[in-house]
From Swiss-Prot:
Keywords: DNA replication, Plasmid. Residues 249-287 are annotated as: Disordered. The keyword DNA-binding does not apply. GO terms for biological process: DNA replication. It comes from Sinorhizobium fredii (strain NBRC 101917 / NGR234). The keyword Metal-binding does not apply. This is Putative replication protein C. InterPro entries: RepABC_RepC (IPR047611), RepC_C (IPR021760), RepC_N (IPR005090).
Length: 404
């Protein structure tokens, strides 16, 4: 503003606090402040969503900037442009006068433009004897210049957010493709599981994806999708492990040999002294497979697990493994923690342990941490599901006697 005073609109247009704030901000503009008008305009276009201005309003701002004679906006060159409505309409690609006024008002309300109206409301400039502009009435670009740094920061943030959204969308697309194909192969191969329910859950997640998405709305949906993909992958992995155990004669033979330690074979020590030696503590106890407990025993000790089997029934070890995957998700146990337990204890014992954790879930603050602790102990040979199952059986037997 040339004289630093507050100006009010001409005619019936009323003054607003927003217009007043823009003028006060312009008065605080440092004399040395400057900015390339077209770079600033590009940043303004980038920051458009956060500033709440439309593309048509940006067209009007572009036209106004084209009337500024210099490339660099600065107080030294003056910040008032004074085109007539006809000239402005031509530069704004023939925009109607009523539309032009509406978008100018939007720019003023957004704090990007200020009116400097003459006594009669017309836009013009008065020059001095040297031909320099002495007084001008029209639109002040001072608010735009005063917010240059803010606009550039917003534009940078919008770029980062757009890049983040693009990456999230890419991950979401890959995840959707993976889930669709994994469900398809599970159904084609006849893998046990409630695949109709899983597919319905997947479709419900897809339905929550908004048409106009942001990083904040896509991130939680992607997290749910990735958890679902992990659960499907675990179910298929369990199926593959079961097939490997049942279909590999060498593994079956080794299992039989390990189940009868009194039998001799070619790997036994040759001398009596060696035969009488106790195993060295340095040998890891987990070289021997952990004992698998009968399904009936697990179900008597942990009856709650049956509710999570296919159709609400656990009738086989495979059903127990599938129920354990559902319980893992319900108790917020991470897939990696359960996978580690399967690798250390075997899938049958890991599912039995999950059944025990479910049975005692009211007394366990962190099921995931508890499972990791049991896995570590099992790796050192310090844990077996047997004592836990027996304790639950004894507790259930006592409660049954009290109930009777």
């Amino acid at each position: 503003m040339q004289d630093g005073s507050v100006t009010t609109p001409f005619g019936r247009r009323s003054m607003t606090l927003g217009m007043l704030a823009s003028q006060y901000m312009s008065r605080e503009l440092e004399p040395e402040t400057s900015a390339d008008k077209w770079k600033l305009f590009r940043a303004l276009c980038e920051a458009k969503p956060k500033l709440g201005i439309s593309e048509r309003a940006l067209s009007v701002m572009n036209a106004l900037l084209s009337f500024y004679p210099e490339t660099t906006l600065s107080e030294e060159n003056g910040l008032i442009v004074f085109p007539s409505n006809m000239q402005l309409s031509l530069r704004a690609h023939g925009m109607a006068e009523a539309t032009l006024r509406r978008h100018i008002a939007a720019l003023v309300d957004a704090g990007l433009l200020a009116r400097r109206d003459s006594p009669n409301g017309k836009r013009y400039a008065r020059k001095d004897g040297d031909g320099s502009i002495d007084e001008a009435y029209g639109f002040s670009l001072a608010p735009l210049l005063s917010r240059a740094r803010e606009i550039e920061q917003i534009a940078a943030y919008v770029k980062i957010e757009r890049l983040q959204l693009r990456r999230l969308r890419e991950r979401l697309t890959i995840c959707r493709r993976d889930i669709g194909k994994l469900i398809e192969v599970a159904i084609e191969e006849g893998v046990d599981g409630n695949w109709d329910g899983i597919h319905q859950h997947y479709r419900s997640l897809v339905a929550t994806i908004p048409r106009v998405a942001t990083a904040a709305t896509v991130a939680p949906i992607l997290e749910e999708m990735e958890m679902l993909r992990e659960e499907i992958s675990n179910l298929l992995e369990i199926r593959l492990k079961i097939e490997n155990l049942s279909g590999n004669p060498d593994q079956i033979e080794r299992h039989k040999q390990n189940s009868h330690p009194e039998s001799t074979n070619e790997f036994e020590p040759s001398s009596r002294e060696e035969q009488g030696e106790r195993p060295s503590p340095a040998i890891e106890p987990q070289r021997e497979p952990m004992k698998v407990f009968p399904l009936g025993m697990v179900l008597r000790a942990c009856p709650s697990i049956s509710d999570y089997g296919p159709g609400g029934v656990v009738a086989s070890p495979r059903d127990l493994m599938q129920a354990a995957v559902v319980v893992r998700s319900m108790l917020c146990v991470s897939p990696s923690a359960y996978q580690d337990a399967c690798e250390v204890m075997g899938p049958e014992n890991a599912s039995a342990v999950m059944a025990c954790i479910l049975e005692r879930s009211g007394h366990i603050k962190s099921p995931g941490g508890y499972l990791r602790d049991l896995t570590s102990r099992a790796k050192r040979g310090e844990f077996s599901p047997g004592p836990v199952l027996m304790a639950l059986l004894r507790a259930r037997g006592g409660s049954d006697r009290l109930a009777s």
